[in-house]
């Protein structure tokens, strides 16, 4: 706001909310370059965090014996060796083909935002042609409710010809056993496809 714009109209705010992009109200005296620097730094940190988590999870799933590749990274994020974990495998099909590439990344981005805003103790990453979620210290009932809500959200973002397949592993105890939960969810998904 400033000498040319006295206030941001509700129609602008509604449009921005509908399209999922932010609207900032900034006093005229604040330099735009400083705001952009802060926003870019926050985005970069968020992307770096997502890459670290995805790498650590993929290492935990695929290279479980090489603990140095994932244990300390996940512990720094608050996921401890003695916690209980459940892996959820999400596959998106269009006709009979698994959705990949840009479309899968779009779905993961929307899902990650939804998780970040609504839940704690859930990690997400894309792997190959699927999305993987890791729930930490959720009871069976809590896990079921969360997965139902996540499934509903995924159905809302799915295109008309897309199907969402979700398989949930049994809960395992310990970060070093995460690969077992992953393998179980993977086998369940293979049976569904």
Where are these regions (language model features)?
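Generic recognition of stable, solvent-exposed alpha-helical segments in well-folded globular domains
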Residues: 106, 145, 177-183
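Alpha-helical/coil-rich non-catalytic "connector" segments in signaling and regulatory proteins
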Residues: 1-85, 103-168
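Cyclic nucleotide signaling catalytic output domains
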Residues: 167-173, 180-193
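A generic structural signal for short coil/turn motifs at secondary-structure boundaries
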Residues: 96-100, 141-143, 175-177
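Short beta-strand-to-loop capping motifs
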Residues: 90-96, 134-138, 170
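Catalytic-site or vestigial catalytic-site microsegments of nucleotide-handling domains
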Residues: 80-98
């Amino acid at each position: 706001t400033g000498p040319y714009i006295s206030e941001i109209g509700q129609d602008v705010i509604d449009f921005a909310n509908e399209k999922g992009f932010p609207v900032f109200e900034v006093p005229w005296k604040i330099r735009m370059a400083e705001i952009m620097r802060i926003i870019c730094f926050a985005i970069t940190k968020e992307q770096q965090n997502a890459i670290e988590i995805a790498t650590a999870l993929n290492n935990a799933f695929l290279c479980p014996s090489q603990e140095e590749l994932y244990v300390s990274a996940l512990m720094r994020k608050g996921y401890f060796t003695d916690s209980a974990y459940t892996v959820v495998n999400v596959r998106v099909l269009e006709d009979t083909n698994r959705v990949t590439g840009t479309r899968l990344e779009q779905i993961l981005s929307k899902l990650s935002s939804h998780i970040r805003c609504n839940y704690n103790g859930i990690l997400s990453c894309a792997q190959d042609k699927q999305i993987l979620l890791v729930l930490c210290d959720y009871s069976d009932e809590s896990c079921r409710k969360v997965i139902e809500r996540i499934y509903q959200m995924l159905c809302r973002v799915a295109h008309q010809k897309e199907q969402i397949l979700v398989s949930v592993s049994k809960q395992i105890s310990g970060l070093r056993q995460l690969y077992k939960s992953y393998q179980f969810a993977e086998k369940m998904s293979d049976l569904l496809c």
